[in-house]
Regions:
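ATP/NTP phosphate-donor binding region
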Residues: 1-23, 28-35, 39, 67-70
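Short glycine-rich anion-binding loops that position phosphate/pyrophosphate groups of nucleotides
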Residues: 25-28, 50-53, 104, 171-172
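Short, well-ordered alpha-helical microsegments
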Residues: 29-30, 107, 249
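Short glycine-/acidic-enriched loop or helix-start segments at secondary-structure transitions
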Residues: 31-34, 57-58, 109, 177-178, ...
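Catalytic core of DAGKc-family lipid kinases
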Residues: 39-46, 51-161
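Glycine-rich phosphate/pyrophosphate-binding beta-alpha loops
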Residues: 103, 107, 165-180, 246
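ATP/nucleoside-binding phosphotransfer catalytic cores, i.e., glycine-rich phosphate-binding loops
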Residues: 153, 160, 179-180, 185-265
Length: 265
């Protein structure tokens, strides 16, 4: 039987209201929400996290336990408003949504390497997907070079000649549970940008130590920006990802804002 997805309204009967439930990881959720992009943004979407990272679930307070997540969904009576990242890339006229992060440089290269790993699926079956991710970090870390970027926000421009990691996020987590911006809030209509400069291994290790203690802001090589609209220009081609889905390797001129979507949990 066909079911028509409907925009949410307070006067609708909750017991008969149709809900699309996504089962999968962050990449699956990314693909579904972008498939719904042309439709009414008031159509609610539900989600049961079954992936290896499940950063969206962490970021919005949805249980990563399948049974508990289902219980959250069943007892819900109205959807929650979550701000997603809306990105527009001028060079290729590309438009999309991300529920977690959009990154270029190191994190995108790590994601690409992990996705190429022949051991990823096998490790995920035993809930050891993080081992594949760690292996990719070690492999990519020494190969990733610094690259120039221009950041534009609030009428100001910031130039980084040797960016190493550049990530736009709407909640605290990336990389399967790393709290890179503890203050990021997916219910606020702002995006957070992190830029880490290319530095030597000893300074990187110190930055990782600070990151584990959530004191990364003390490093002068760690830069955090927040705004309702951020533009990033990179003239040197870099690997780009959105929610762990590789968008390609290219130069970009990308503008990031937020778009409110309804989630049922």
């Amino acid at each position: 039987a066909e079911t028509t997805l409907l925009p949410w309204s307070e006067d609708l009967d909750v017991s008969t209201f149709p809900i699309l439930v996504v089962l999968g990881g962050d990449g699956t959720l990314h693909n579904v929400i972008n498939s719904l992009l042309p439709y009414d943004s008031a159509i609610p979407l539900s989600y049961i996290p079954c992936g290896s990272g499940n950063d969206f679930a962490r970021g919005v307070g949805l249980s990563r336990n399948i049974d508990k997540a289902l219980h959250q969904i069943l007892r819900t009576r109205r959807p929650k408003e979550i701000q997603t990242i809306h990105y527009v890339e001028a060079n290729q006229e590309e438009i999309g949504l991300a529920t977690n992060n959009v990154g270029l440089g190191l994190d995108a290269a790590i994601v690409e390497k992990t996705n190429e790993s022949s051991s990823k699926k096998a490790l995920n079956k035993f809930k050891l997907g993080s081992l594949s991710y760690i292996s990719s970090i070690i492999h990519v870390f020494f190969k990733q070079k610094g690259f120039p970027i221009l950041v534009e926000m609030n009428g100001k421009q910031y130039t980084f000649n040797r960016a190493f990691l550049c990530t736009v996020t709407n909640h605290p987590y990336f990389g399967g549970g790393v709290s890179i911006i503890p203050t990021a809030n997916p219910r606020k209509a702002v995006v957070d940008l992190v830029v880490v400069e290319r530095i030597n291994i000893f300074k990187i290790l110190w930055l990782i130590f600070l990151l584990l203690r959530q004191k990364q802001g003390k490093s002068k090589h760690f830069h955090h920006f927040q705004s309702s609209k951020i533009r990033i220009v990179s003239t040197i081609p870099q690997t780009i990802h959105a929610d762990g889905e590789i968008l390609g390797k290219r130069s970009i001129d990308m503008v990031y804002t937020t778009q409110k979507r309804l989630f049922w949990f």
